[in-house]
């Protein structure tokens, strides 16, 4: 079911006060009373909250840099979007457009392989669908062509995650794509009764796997601790 999202606000939680943005005005953190640390935490660990509501009522256009990332939060008073971008240009974010399905990506811009999710209802699982050109969860390279003998692939989401893992670990994207294909067949919500979950089928001890970001972070932790041996290599 497509949803038209009205601007219920996160302002109380974030402490955003005393700001009304005009069209085209870009506000840095110094221009508004913004809890930057909380916004950063939401962007990395609680994306569902940012997806569900704008950070304040009314229009705003807020940008700031913290710990090597550029963070962007915008709204026209009805629809809103957010994203964060590392120094190397790799981005992760969410665009919420009234009357449209949710779309997310790891990178934005043209000529980019991207991934989006089609939320059928507020309680439904998400599935990969064709990508938009707006803020999206993808990498700047095309999807991997890895396909296992049993037909498993990393899928679009998994291929994007494999590219990011390659950047963060130095292990080739094709290796990570093969791991994802074998472990989860590219299914973000894959779950094993043993407790392993996500694209990489990491155990709970490596961290939560509610979002793609969290799954990548958990896989990086597992790799740093055990190398590819964590996946039997």
UniProtKB/Swiss-Prot annotation:
Localization of this protein: Secreted
Cellular component aspect of the GO annotation: extracellular region
Signal peptide start and end residues: 1-29
Free-text disruption phenotype from the record: Up-regulation of ssaA and sceD. Its inactivation shows no clumping and results in an apparent increased degree of cell separation which could be due to the up-regulation of sceD. Inactivation of both isaA and sceD genes results in a high degree of clumping and the double mutant is also attenuated for virulence.
GO MF, one annotated term: hydrolase activity, acting on glycosyl bonds
Chief location category: secreted
Expression induction or repression: Increased expression in vivo during human sepsis. Highly expressed under biofilm conditions after 8 hours of growth. Positively regulated by SarA and the two-component system YycFG. Also positively regulated by the two-component sensor-regulator SrrAB under aerated conditions. More protein is secreted in a secG or double secG/secY2 mutant (at protein level).
Enzyme Commission code(s) on record: 3.2.-.-
Record keywords, A-Z: Glycosidase, Hydrolase, Secreted, Signal
Similarity section: Belongs to the transglycosylase family. IsaA subfamily.
Task performed by this protein: Is able to cleave peptidoglycan.
Protein name: Probable transglycosylase IsaA
Gene: isaA
């Amino acid at each position: 079911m497509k949803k038209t999202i009205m601007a219920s606000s996160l302002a109380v939680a974030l402490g955003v006060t005393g700001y009304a943005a005009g069209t085209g005005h870009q506000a840095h953190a110094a221009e508004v009373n913004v809890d930057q640390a909380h916004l950063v935490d939401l962007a990395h660990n609680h994306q569902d909250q940012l997806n569900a509501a704008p950070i304040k009522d009314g229009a705003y256009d807020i940008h700031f840099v913290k710990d090597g990332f550029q963070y962007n939060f915008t709204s026209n008073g009805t629809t809103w979007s957010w994203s964060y971008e590392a120094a190397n240009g790799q981005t992760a974010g969410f665009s919420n457009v009234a009357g449209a399905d949710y779309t997310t990506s790891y990178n934005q811009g043209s000529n980019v392989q991207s991934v989006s999710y089609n939320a059928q209802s507020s309680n439904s699982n998400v599935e990969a669908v064709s990508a938009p050109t707006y803020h999206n969860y993808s990498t700047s390279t095309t999807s991997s062509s890895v396909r296992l003998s049993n037909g498993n692939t990393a899928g679009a989401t998994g291929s994007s995650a494999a590219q990011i893992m390659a950047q963060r670990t130095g292990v080739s994207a094709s290796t990570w794509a093969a791991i994802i294909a074998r472990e989860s067949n590219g299914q973000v919500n894959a779950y094993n009764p043993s407790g392993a979950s996500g694209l990489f089928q990491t155990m709970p001890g490596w961290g939560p796997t509610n979002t793609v970001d969290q799954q990548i972070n958990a896989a990086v932790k597992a790799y740093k601790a055990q190398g590819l041996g964590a996946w039997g290599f």
